Curated annotation (Swiss-Prot):
Subcellular localization, as worded in the UniProt entry: Cell membrane; Cytoplasm
Keyword set, alphabetical order: ATP-binding, Cell membrane, Cytoplasm, Membrane, Nucleotide-binding, Protein transport, Translocase, Translocation, Transport
Name of the protein: Protein translocase subunit SecA
Alphabetical GO biological process terms: intracellular protein transmembrane transport; protein import; protein targeting; protein transport by the Sec complex
Lineage: Bacteria, Bacillati, Bacillota, Bacilli, Lactobacillales
Entry GO CC: cell envelope Sec protein transport complex; cytosol; plasma membrane
CDD domains noted in UniProt: DEXDc_SecA (cd17928), SF2_C_secA (cd18803)
Residues at which ATP binds: 100, 118-122, 508
Family: Belongs to the SecA family.
Principal localisation: membrane
Length: 803
């Protein structure tokens, strides 16, 4: 039987062999490029653009054009990469290594390059970005925050500008004109957050010139790709409008749950991050709210608020899951340790936390537009990414994004030592051991980076270090303004830096003078994260570019991960060994248990992301249809009669069919058809019951359609200017579409939140959602067409029509 591991290794070797061969071709141009003058090298950009234009000239079919473009870019790759490489040497003083060329080839191929920390991912990207920007279709370089977008655009932009390409930076709060200019550049630096919301907002505009993204989604190159494509994928992007005010039930539910006793009145499920009332708790609820049955069908709103209050109070922890700043509850991104500005929990959970923290409860918003990052990035013609850690999520990246993860060798051998985990029975004993090691290392002058699992833990460790008179910096979600400065200095002699997960990404930690001789940077972690990737990122801060260093993880049986998954087996083993609190355990069983727990969490998180995607895939088909129809209307330059009149005809057919269901024509509801004509199609006395009697169903439809056509011609004559007529048609159609689409999105949001309960009735929630979402969409289309018909046909024409 074939060994699957051997097959994977062989495939990996084949991939690297192929990459090496192409990288050799790139390097073969080195002397030629070096001999060119600046102007000769810069002229290559125009030469490449001409070759691309010639390759796709005269090809009308879009798919064939895209294939021709891909072919010519592949042919140009060795020479174009060599141009960008030589340009980097002259402009930036940096010359990409062989392994960086390999990484950039992976990026051009639409895959994910896994490159260790300090291997120069930003420089690696330049060659693939340059080549793909030559097409003039736009390249989006996606980063995790505005700071990195601005930094990389400024640094690498010098190279692109020198080579004759334009560079734009899309900052979140920039005005529309600046965003438009940024997106129209050859290369655009932006965060995933900004691109997602700009895409949604562009599909809510009423005029073509209001869009900021004037071109399609061509090529995205994502930095820290695992963070963006995986960690943020559980939270959909939602544009909201004002809702129906704040319910008083949030405060009442919060007061109630604060009277309850743990284990007696409720049970906390740490693994599922849920809290459930016991029978005693339910009884107390019935007394508190003066009800006979807390779970009566008439009181579902109350029970929903109680459920959210329970989660807010007992599953969401202050300074771990969120912070309170300036009277607001702000979420902490668990993968980065940073505050997720502008992100709110849905389904009333955020309001429940606000009630818990006694800050102003903000009203629930109505969803108007939404998309998941999975579906956003799958719309790009080509998607690639780079990160230090992705192999653990290889299956998900392949299945969701059709990307292969290819590990690029390091330029120099890795000398960092990753020591075995140390396990203690209690948090107190663990911190004692951590501080003891910090003191020992600090006496030598060796720099130390200590990674903690939460803001709360970083502040606790900081207090302990203060009592020991150990000078240190703290970096967490509360003080991330100095992030770059703190991290940049973390490799200096004697530096002690306490940080949350945010220390694992972004700015490199470079060793100060004399630090290499001391053994390099030491990374200490006070617990294992849910994800092995986050642990590996933290480890990767030490030993960059062949530097020395080591990493050490300290764990306790009281850590969140151990409590939620698998601590019991380890605890029993330690009890059998009869160990005291301060005794440390280190063996392969512990490491395997922890990694097993992490795999379970990663599996759960993958299931959550897949679930979010499955539900969004239902909406995706509807969203693409609506957005396409909006684009057709907005981009029309002559007349929308060909769009509007079929909508009118379908509305007529629906109304007539609904009122003529009976076999006998004498039983047809002709007065209702006459009422429809007066309400939505023509003037009140345009048709009578007598005129419809004796006609067949099809003849009635034809008569009503003829009335509609006459009405349309009348509107045309009143609006003698075709431009005004077109503007009128656009306003009518877009208003109807937008009103009903936003209502539909909000109703789907509520449907998704409620459909899970049907699982208790042995029904598949996803299938139920698909079925109802489709039925609701069909009804929405009918409502849009009816409102368009009524508004257009019954409108009194006035001049200066504007949306």
């Amino acid at each position: 039987m074939a060994n699957p591991i051997r097959k994977l290794v062989d495939n990996s070797k084949q991939q690297l062999k192929k990459l090496n061969k192409i990288a050799d071709q790139v390097e073969s141009y080195a002397d030629t490029m070096a001999s060119m003058s600046d102007s000769e090298l810069q002229a290559k950009t125009g030469e490449f653009k001409s070759k691309i234009a010639d390759a796709i000239d005269g090809i009308e079919d879009k798919d064939k054009q895209n294939k021709a473009l891909a072919k010519v870019l592949d042919e140009l790759l060795p020479e174009a990469f060599a141009v960008a490489r030589e340009g980097a040497k002259r402009v930036l003083g940096l010359y990409p290594f062989h392994v960086q060329i390999m990484g950039s080839i992976v990026l051009h191929g639409g895959n994910l390059a896994e490159m260790r920390t300090g291997e120069g991912k930003t420089l690696t990207a330049t060659m693939a970005v340059y080549l793909n920007a030559l097409s003039g279709r736009g390249v989006h370089v996606v980063t995790v925050n505005d700071y990195l977008s601005a930094r990389d655009a400024e640094q690498m932009g010098q190279l692109y500008n020198w080579l004759g390409l334009t560079v734009g930076v899309n900052v979140g709060d920039a005005p529309a004109e600046e965003k438009r200019a940024a997106y129209n550049a050859d290369i655009t630096y932006s965060t995933n957050f900004n691109i997602g919301f700009d895409y949604l907002r562009d599909n809510m505009v009423r005029r073509a010139d209001e869009r900021v993204m004037q071109r399609g989604l061509n090529f995205a190159l994502i930095d820290e790709a695992d963070s963006i494509l995986i960690d943020t994928a559980r939270t959909p992007l939602i544009i909201s409008g004002p809702g129906s005010g704040v319910s008083q039930l949030y405060a009442r539910a919060d007061r109630f749950v604060k009277t309850l006793q743990r284990d007696e009145d409720f049970k906390v499920d740490e693994e599922a991050k849920a809290t459930l009332l016991t029978p005693e708790g339910i009884h107390k609820g019935e007394i508190f709210f003066n009800l006979n049955n807390l779970y009566d069908a008439d009181d579902t709103a109350l029970t929903h608020h109680i459920d959210q209050a329970l989660r807010a109070n007992f599953n969401y922890i202050k300074d771990k899951d969120y912070v309170v700043q300036d009277g607001e509850v702000k979420l902490i991104d668990q993968s980065t340790g940073r505050i997720s500005e502008g992100t709110r929990l849905s389904d009333g959970l955020h309001q429940a936390i606000e009630a818990k923290e006694n800050v102003e409860i903000q009203e629930e918003n109505k969803s108007m537009a939404q998309i998941t990052y999975q579906n956003l990035f799958r719309m790009y013609k080509k998607l690639s990414g780079m990160t230090g850690t992705a192999k653990t999520e290889e299956e998900e990246l392949r299945e969701i994004y059709n990307m292969e993860v290819i590990s690029i060798p390091t330029n120099r051998p890795v000398r960092r030592v990753d020591k075995p985990d140390l396990l203690y029975t209690s948090i107190r004993a663990k911190y004692n051991a951590v501080v003891k090691l910090i003191v020992e290392l600090h006496e030598k002058g060796q720099p130390i980076l200590i990674g903690t699992g939460s803001v709360e833990d970083s502040e606790l460790l900081s207090k302990i270090l203060m009592t020991k008179n150990l000078p240190h910096n703290v970096l967490n979600a509360k003080n991330n303004a100095k992030e770059a400065e703190i991290i940049a200095n973390a490799g200096q002699r004697g530096a002690i830096t306490v940080a949350t997960n945010m220390a694992g990404r972004g700015t490199d930690i470079k060793l100060g003078p004399g630090v290499a001789e001391l053994g390099g940077l030491v990374v200490i972690a006070t617990e294992r994260h849910e994800s092995r990737r986050i642990d590996n990122q933290l480890r990767g801060r030490a030993g960059r570019q062949g530097d020395e260093g080591f990493s050490q993880f300290f764990l306790s049986l009281e850590d969140d991960l151990m409590i939620r998954f698998g601590a019991e087996r380890v605890r029993l083993m330690m009890q059998r060994m009869n160990l005291d609190e301060d005794t440390v355990i280190t063996n392969r069983f512990i490491t395997r248990s922890v990694e097993s727990a992490q795999k379970r969490v990663e599996g759960n998180n993958y299931d959550t992301r897949k679930n979010v995607l499955q539900y969004d895939d239902v909406v995706r088909e509807q969203r693409e249809l609506i957005y396409h129809e909006r684009d057709v209307v907005i981009d029309e330059s002559e007349s929308l009669e060909w769009v509007l009149m079929p909508m009118v005809e379908r509305t007529i057919n629906r109304v007539v069919d609904a009122q003529t269901k009976e076999k006998k024509s004498s039983d047809w509801n002709l007065p209702q058809i006459v009422a429809f004509v007066g309400n939505a199609l023509a003037h009140d006395d345009a048709v009578t019951v007598q005129q419809l009697q004796g006609l067949t169903r099809d003849e009635i439809k034809a008569k009503l359609l003829e009335l509609a056509k006459l009405n349309y011609k009348e509107k045309q004559s009143q609006l003698y200017d075709p431009e005004q007529m077109l503007e009128f048609e656009k306003v009518v159609i877009l208003r109807a579409v937008d009103q009903h689409w936003t209502d539909h999105i909000d109703s789907l949001d509520r449907l998704r939140q409620g459909v899970g309960l049907r699982g208790y009735g042995q029904l598949n929630p996803l299938i139920e959602y698909q079925s109802e979402a489709f039925a609701n969409f069909q009804k929405m289309i009918a409502d849009v067409e009816y409102d368009t018909t009524r508004t257009f046909m019954k409108a009194e024409i006035r001049q200066n029509l504007r949306s």
